[in-house]
Amino acid sequence: MNKAKNSGAVPQFVDNFEDFYNNGDDILNNKHKEEINFVKYRIFDTHLINYNNNNNNKNNNNNNNNNENTTITNKLNEIKEYLILNYIKDYIWQKEPFNLKIYDHKKKQQQQQQLPIHFYGNTKFEESIDDEWFIVYILLELTKKFQSLIVSIKDNDGEFILIETAQALPKWIKPTNSNNRVYLKNGEIHIIPLPSDPSQLDTIPYKMDTNTALSILSSSSNNIITKVSNEINEILKNRLKRFYNGEYFLKDQNQIKLAAIPIEIGYLLNQYPQLISDITTTFYNRDSDDMKTISTMKRFPMSRERDSFGNSGQLITTNIRFTRCLYAMLKLQQWNSPKNFHPQLPKPSHPTYDSRSLGVKIICGLEMVYNRSKRNSVSSYHRFNDDLNWLNYLKQLKSNNYFNDETIGSKLYKEKLLIAKNQYLKNNINNNNNNNNKEEESIYKLIDQVTNSKSVDEMIKILQESDKSKIESEDDWLNEENPDKFEDLITEFENDRQKQQQKQQQQQQQQQQNKEGKKEVKENNNNNNNNNNNNNNNNNNNNNNNNNNNNDSNLINDFSNQFKSMLSQLSSFDGVEFNEKSGNSKNKTKSSAYGNGGDDNISFDSNKFMDILKGFTDNNKYDDDYDDDDDDDDDMYQDIDNYEDSDDKDDDEDDENDEDDEDDGFEEYEDEDEDDDDEKEFQYVEFLKKSTIKQYMERMDQELNLKIIASSFELESTKLPKEFDDIEKSNNNNNNNINNNDKDVDEDDNENYKVNQKVDLNLNLVKNLLESLTEQQGFAGPASTLLKEMSDNNSKKREKKKTSSKKLIPKKGKVKENK
């Protein structure tokens, strides 16, 4: 009890964590529909591992086993004592506290991978993600204190540290190859790389296991670099800066508010501040059974007289410590006090309304916690959802129809389930003779013991002394509705990303300058090159003056080309990466075929390879000189031949039908139309057989241009030939003298010319994007996203052009001196 009191937390213990660590995702997802946020961690001590291996090599006896157990237990107690005294003594956890247990590797020999001796734990943090990062913080500090420790930590999303530092990670790191490669050591992140060549596969396997990873991290003889860059560590430290500078403990962990509660409850929360977490979460997630207990209020009746439990019924306004998350959950709950409460709540405008309302919620929450603990009795501390043996036992009960097809959650189902849980725990206690974890006192017994441990006067004195050191906190942060803060966070993230990109560009520029400095270039060649550059610059200036007249058309063409180049970028399932042109690939560091990279290793330039392939395909596509189409091998032409054969049969049938039609007295012009259709159809088939793919596509375009769909595209704005201008003039001047047949001929000529007009792809692209932007009405959408990516890509190119132009300045100076 004293240890729990000093740690500021109700004792909470977990069984079978080693099974839950490996199978926790499946257990939690199958047991609960909603996702449960949890973090799981393992602490390996290289000294303990070596000590255990040495004992295994010797003859095993009872003395060695006892010494080994003593050493492991002492190390665990040393770690716990350090963490409690320096970090978690007064920490209020949202759901579950940080906890460590010894991994009994001797009982896990049936597993495929036998892990070495270590300590492990699991913590559910639910709404408060700060608990997760606080655990990362204390584990980092723990590895600084004990440099023999190596820590692995994951959550329900996997390697969440990699997710946090994703913007600075090497390109080779993927979710599929990062398993068992990420660890904390000496207060920093360590990532075991992939093998850089096949000779390293023995020491660095592609599929990493825990034992191999520990041997790599603990060995100083190998040349494997596992320490990540300073940039990655800085991102993690920036995420944990609230813990390092103490801001989190002063504000988020220390929300002090006045509450009018019974004296006994005030004293209870003063001695065990962690209970406020159980009170808040139980009140927040209350069910129908909890609401029934509120209607009676048997344990904490709000009356003026002393009850059977010894409660005085006197209220005291005292300072209660919350976390900001817990206070927000309790404060924002709409709740009216029950009718049996005395006295009733004042009006919201009353000065004491906030303290009275908060006190009523605390009283009701504690009543729920007390009765829920008493209902569960002996099973209150056992976490059945995390016990694989219990889950298997429950499956057997269901298969034997123990619940008699009762609905889950019904009263009879709960009664049977409670009986099964109690019987399961009793069997475990009887079967485990060497059980060192004795059954702890349940919460309701703890509440009874603490509230009756001192007199009312003594409790009042303790509360008054405690209130002197507590200053009530403001809750203005709870009512903030300033959207600018969210924008500030986004801009801060963007600024950090831009700074990192600038650092990378500066490093690349320095590497290029170093390479250029090593090259020796003759002065004559430099002078000639400089003269040529000057001439080229003059020519470029003249060309720029000539191009100013066509700014409008160039803007559209440039926009279209940028859009096309953006869409032509290679994308993987990780997203689009805007790579530079293939000409710059020479300046990039060579990446290894195995992903890790090296100077002397076999390299594979994927960008250059794709450019070569793209060049082949571009040269062969729509080539006018390529006339070697093999019609026989093309399925389309086989279909045409089959179509022609069927046409011959149809023609014979049509001839017979035509004879019948003549006998029936059909008119001649109908027969002529049918003959024309047959002739056109025959010509079309002949055209398909003799034409190439390109001609076939052009013919299809001509047919589509005659349809309605042609009006939906913008055509190129070219001037009509002189013949059409003359036709239009003659139509205007001699409109009354021209017959209708001539008009039809002119209109057909105009239509034929329009059919041959090309679609202005650039103008259509700009038009469609502008229409899409107007439809977005200022909100985010696909068009704005594409334009943003284009602007980012162009800004990078401009910066590179500026840097390249700056490098030419000293060369021009040399030319002037030589002249």
UniProtKB/Swiss-Prot annotation:
GO terms for cellular component: nucleus. InterPro entries: Ecd. Residues 501-514, 524-551, 581-592, 730-740 have a biased composition (Low complexity). Residues 624-680 have a biased composition (Acidic residues). Keywords: Activator, Transcription, Transcription regulation. It comes from the Eukaryota. It holds the Pfam family SGT1. Residues 797-819 have a biased composition (Basic residues). Residues 494-558, 578-603, 617-680, 725-749, 778-819 are annotated as: Disordered. Belongs to the ECD family. May act as a transcriptional activator. This is Protein ecdysoneless homolog.
